[in-house]
Regions:
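Juxtamembrane segments of multi-pass membrane glycosylation machinery
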Residues: 46-52, 60-84, 103, 134-135
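Single conserved hydrophobic/aromatic residue that forms the stacking wall/gate
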Residues: 135-147
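Extracytoplasmic catalytic/substrate-binding loops of multi-pass membrane glycan-assembly enzymes
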Residues: 27-39, 49-61
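Start-transfer (signal-anchor) and selected internal transmembrane alpha helices
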Residues: 1-22, 88-91, 117-124
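Loop-to-helix entry region of an early transmembrane alpha helix in multi-pass inner-membrane enzymes
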Residues: 55, 68-96, 117, 121, ...
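Membrane-water interface at transmembrane helix exits
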Residues: 22, 27, 61, 65, ...
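Short helix- or helix-capping micro-motifs
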Residues: 124-132
Length: 147
């Protein structure tokens, strides 16, 4: 079981690094269309925003905006924050998938075979990284359908 926890944590954090790197490489350096400028402004100035999850987002965005050298780089810092938080979402998705698959595949928690370990980790990795790629595919497709 200790080996499972070590491998699960290690692969989970590697998944986070992969996701956060991809998201950070593709951030917008300034404000873009839709609701992004509103989120950046409400996070920077701590003003009232309309989405339900806004208070947590605004507080974390304000924390990251404190690292901006001047007002022109606030948008980039908030976009980096969003990329890192999205990477954390992929991390927790990986851990959720491996937890569920472990309950389905492994019958004896004290005797985990290498095949079972590979099955559980592979399921989590495929599920988390498939979600990562779906986000990048769905947004351009949605924009193409609107225009």
């Amino acid at each position: 079981m200790k080996q499972y926890k070590t491998v699960n944590n290690l692969i989970g954090w590697i998944t986070f690094i992969i996701a956060a790197t991809v998201y950070c490489m593709t951030i917008e350096p300034t404000a873009s269309f839709w609701d992004c400028p509103e989120f950046i402004t409400t996070g920077y100035k701590l003003e009232v925003g309309h989405p339900p999850g806004a208070p947590f987002f605004m507080l974390v965005a304000n924390l990251f905006s404190q690292f901006a050298s001047d007002a022109s780089t606030v948008a980039k810092m908030v976009n980096y924050m969003s990329a890192l938080m999205s990477g954390a979402c992929i991390l927790f998705l990986f851990w959720s998938i491996t937890h569920l698959v472990r309950k389905l595949v492994i019958t004896d928690e004290n005797n985990i075979t290498k095949g079972q370990l590979i099955t559980v980790m592979g399921s989590g990795l495929v599920g988390a990284l498939a979600y990562l790629s779906l986000i990048h595919i769905s947004e351009p497709t949605r924009l193409q359908l609107i225009s």
